[in-house]
Amino acid sequence: IGRTGIMLLSCGTGAWRVRQSMNTLAEQLGLTCTADIGLMSIEYTCFDGEECYSQSLCLTNTGVNTSKLNRLEQFINKFSSEGVYMTGEELHSHLDQIEKIHGLYSPTALGFAAALACGAFTFLLGGGPVEMFCAFAGAGIGNFVRCKLGKHHFTLFLCIFASVTSACLVYAGLFEVMKLILGVSEQHEAGYICSMLFIIPGFPFITSGIDLAKLDMRSGLERLTYAIRSE
């Protein structure tokens, strides 16, 4: 139950969904489960009427992995017909296979996608070709760094710091080179912020609102704080 919960949390899903899934599994196993869920940790207790078991679990980083989330939901939905007849070892082996699922796209592809998106935002915010090019390069490198560090399970704020720093340095470096070679003016620095837009965490913003609406205050406030600090 706890492992399924922490795996769901690692996919970026909200506390209400994690708790609902843990309760579904607990009910099928004849247990009662209470859980305190945050952005990156779960403290839960399971009761069987005679004994209880408590455990605290935590993550080093958070992100979004819809492929893994989909497989976990299938596992939970089929648990009543398949999972209850499996041994503990078989269940953990099945979860091991799910845990190995990575995102559909490589860091290179995600970096290129972020570059296109931030370049487009630069255009929408009134930037010209110079700003768009610099933001494209900065965002691409920055998101590539963030994805690579995330795959190696570095801490959340180290990933944010390193990726934003990379984006800023690439933008500033390209801008200085273009000033020397092409003689562009200082006013083109307006696209500097656009090179960091990839770091804005839209998913935690959405899930924080859902958690707060369901009065899950701890998770909602932690997600909202993370989203604001990331900006």
Features from the language model and the residues they span:
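Soluble N-terminal domains of membrane-associated systems
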Residues: 1-89, 97
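Alpha-helical transmembrane segments and their cytosolic membrane-interface
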Residues: 61-117, 122-127, 131, 225-231
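Conserved active-site and cofactor/substrate-binding residues in soluble primary-metabolism enzymes
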Residues: 13, 17-20, 67-70, 86-93, ...
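Hydrophobic alpha-helical transmembrane segments of multi-pass small-molecule transporters/permeases
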Residues: 4, 191-195, 227
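Core alpha-helical transmembrane segments of integral membrane proteins
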Residues: 103-207
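Juxtamembrane helix-boundary/capping and inter-helix hinge elements in multi-pass membrane proteins
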Residues: 154, 185-186, 211-223
